Amino acid sequence: MKAGIHPAYNEISVICACGHSLKTRSTHKGDMRVEICSSCHPFFTGKQKLMDTAGRIDRFEKKYKASRVGKAAPTT
């Protein structure tokens, strides 16, 4: 690598809003603050909110049922 053209690569602390922090290396200067991390994100903590997909499918079928009425089934 050429000397003097690359940014400084330093060890920084990434600090979450929940208080969790971790060390990493980056070209970012100073500490990095984030709103969410793996310690507090619902996907990683298991407190994930599941959507009602069955209800969404029913609404979709109800909405487009009128457009299918009277049309012949596709032939193969």
From Swiss-Prot:
Binds 1 zinc ion per subunit. PROSITE patterns: RIBOSOMAL_L31 (PS01143). Binds the 23S rRNA. The keyword RNA-binding applies. Part of the 50S ribosomal subunit. This is Large ribosomal subunit protein bL31. Belongs to the bacterial ribosomal protein bL31 family. Type A subfamily. Zn(2+) binds at C16, C18, C37, C40. Keywords: Metal-binding, Ribonucleoprotein, Ribosomal protein, RNA-binding, rRNA-binding, Zinc. One of its GO terms (biological process) is translation. The keyword Metal-binding applies. InterPro entries: Ribosomal_bL28/bL31-like_sf, Ribosomal_bL31, Ribosomal_bL31_A, Ribosomal_bL31_sf. PANTHER family: 50S RIBOSOMAL PROTEIN L31, CHLOROPLASTIC, LARGE RIBOSOMAL SUBUNIT PROTEIN BL31A. Its cofactor is Zn(2+). One of its GO terms (cellular component) is ribonucleoprotein complex. GO terms for molecular function: metal ion binding; rRNA binding; structural constituent of ribosome. It comes from the Bacteria.
